[in-house]
Amino acid sequence: MSFRRKEDSLYQINFDETKQVDSFKGVDYSTQSSEQLIDLFSQVLKTGMHGLCFSLYEDGQKPGDTITEEQVRRRMKIIAPYTKWVRSFSCIEGNEFIPIIAKEYGIKTLVGAWLGDDPEINEKEIEGLVKLANEGFVDIAAVGNEVMYRKDLSEDELLEFISRVKDTIPDSIPVGYVDAYYEFSIKPRITAACDLILTNCYP
């Protein structure tokens, strides 16, 4: 596995120093009133979360729609008091505002380039990720999300994108790839190319 920086432990939660909400394991949510559920959720929010996946969309909007900076700013303001990190999934169509605005709030960023089967869009995504990283808005760079799972690219194509990003952004920014956990076991070249393994686990 490639490690571009020794400080990778910066990206691990120190549970001894982080206030944690007691687990809600065993709670039967079907017996809870709306007010009780809101109270449980409020307890989590007040304690704070390590990170959130950030959605810039509002009712009636979807991926492919271009979102304004003002809308991203409005949504970021809502979550800023409750999280230390945000994850974004794309670097185009308004998603590029997410890490910029997050940094204004002192929030760390895991910034993703959404790769698929459209070469032109892939180029825009990679260019956007590189630009944001070189401008100081990226703490962790994610090159693709479940591309192997969806079979949108070949393994070699993905590896080329990962290599390209690593070659064109500062060495201090770890570069990883996001996929279902088992993809990293059956594709060791991808695992070796990543500074960080970013896995999705579905129960």
Residues covered by each model-derived region:
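Alpha-helical scaffolding within the catalytic cores
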Residues: S34-D39, E93-F97, I121-V130, D179-A192
